Amino acid sequence: MGMRFIGSFKKTCSFEDWLKLVDSLKPQMDKHGLKLIFATESEDGTSIYDVGEAATMKGVQAFLSDPEVRQMRVDAGVDIDSQEVISAVGKFNVF
């Protein structure tokens, strides 16, 4: 993979429902060269913070702008307008 990044977005769905959404988006993620490494929910349950990996930034943009992906995310309770790539990530370790 080419790059890793930290992202965030707001949501109205449960964390469990969001995990189901991620499973259903797997074909589109594969198509655009994306992989989620880690995700956590904010303490108040309103946001997700994730670490992802992508072959290219173009793939991330294509995934996030795909009309089918956008609709699936909206239907699941994701506030797509709040989506933010916070930072690129270099080295990291999961303990």
Model-found features: residue ranges?
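Short S/T/G/P-rich N-terminal loop/turn motif that feeds into the first structured element of a domain
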Residues: 1-70, 76, 80-95
